[in-house]
Amino acid sequence: MSALLRSEARKALATSTVSWLLPLTAVVGVVGTLAPLVASSPGTDPLSDDGLQQAMHGAAAGATLVIVAGIVGTAGEWRFGQSTQTFLTTPRRSHVLLAKGLVHLAIGSIYGIAAGVAATAAAWGWYRSNGHTLPLERSAVWLTLLGCLAVSALFGLLGVAIGAIARSQTTAIVGVLGWHVLIEPTLFTASPTVFRWSPGMASFALRRQPSDDFLTAGPAALVLVAFIAALCAAGLRSVERADVTA
């Protein structure tokens, strides 16, 4: 298994998409952090728990890009005709998918750490320029950052699962972006009570975006993990039944 993990890690790190998505995720995290601070109303207290969470949850604003990296790492093998070689080398397809999942869980964590550091630096600069000190010791800050890191790591695994199910890189990426950016927010707006249980809204809750309509962080984490586990099972079934020459 260790050799398989090293192989999958080398393939992931050699993929240019994974390399340029890392700084892009950090940039989006900085924008997601500064935007609510700059746009906040004059009477808003930036040092309140809600104010801190509103700013710091933006560290995971680019987490959708982590899903894209996971999709590329899995569906890309079919797109570029590498699946035959991969599964001939390691016939146990479940082992291959597990290795990909673990590698992209780690990549998601790296993306999350990079985005968290960049977002914290940006927030620290904004607070300082406005006569405040960013209270890093406050739970509203570090629990939010931990939630952002968890979302980023889990989204790496989610991308692998989606890529395994779809096996079409373009279809999977377009579908994820359409669902996450357009469809899911629209459904949530129409019925918050029902669609707060959806995976995207659970991820917002886990990263502690302030809203009375979201789940609390604990149930949100369970929802997200259960959803990803179900997709991983579906992805494994799809890969095991797939024609690797396709």
Predicted regions: what they are:
Residues 1-13:
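A short amphipathic helical element positioned immediately N-terminal to and/or at the very start
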Residues 241-246:
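Short cytosolic juxtamembrane segments of multi-pass membrane proteins
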Residues 11, 75, 86-88, 159, ...:
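Helix-capping/transition residues at the boundaries of transmembrane alpha-helices
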Residues 18-21, 83-86, 96, 171-173:
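Alpha-helical transmembrane segments and their helix-entry boundary regions
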